[in-house]
Amino acid sequence: LRKRALWFVGVLGLTASAIWADDKINVLVWDEQQPVPKKVYANFPGNYIVDHLKKNPRLNVASANINQPEQGLSIKALDESDVLIYWGHVRHRDISEAKSQEIVDRVKAGKLGFVVLHSAHWSVPFMVAMQEVAAEDALEQLPENLRAQVDVRYKGELGWNMPKPDA
């Protein structure tokens, strides 16, 4: 509980610092850009988010999508971002676990904020992030002197038990 409270205070501190910082915050808005949302958002949801965020003079905002080289999530793009806003709808398995781990490693190192929108809670990056949280939670159950001796591993592949579209 203390660790989570410290994390929360840390996030609040980073947020407050960003608000008053002289430097702009670099935001990468990622969108899977598949056809269904285009029926509602002619220019895709991610681009609407980008257009809105660009109104804030404290933000440098870039758009990326799954159809770009390296699925819009190149090392360079991630390194140049302070925050990744990830909009997903149905192409949740199209980002590899390796790429997802790159995102999560940056989040854990405090180099990248990660905001998951719409149904991206089914995405591989979010699921890998939740595995990391589960591993940390499991280790916290052990006495501190034993934690370094334990290697948490996951058996099998990520599972998708998504509800049916009409549920």
Task: Locate the predicted segments by residue.
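Aromatic-Pro/Gly-enriched surface loop or interdomain linker
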Residues: 20-81
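A generic local structural motif
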Residues: 15, 70-73, 100-102
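A glycine-rich, often tryptophan-bearing local segment used as a flexible ligand/cofactor-contacting loop or short
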Residues: 91-167
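Bacterial N-terminal signal peptides
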Residues: 7-17
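N-terminal secretory signal peptides that target proteins for export/translocation
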Residues: 1-3
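The substrate-binding groove and active-site-proximal loops of carbohydrate-active enzymes
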Residues: 36, 85-94
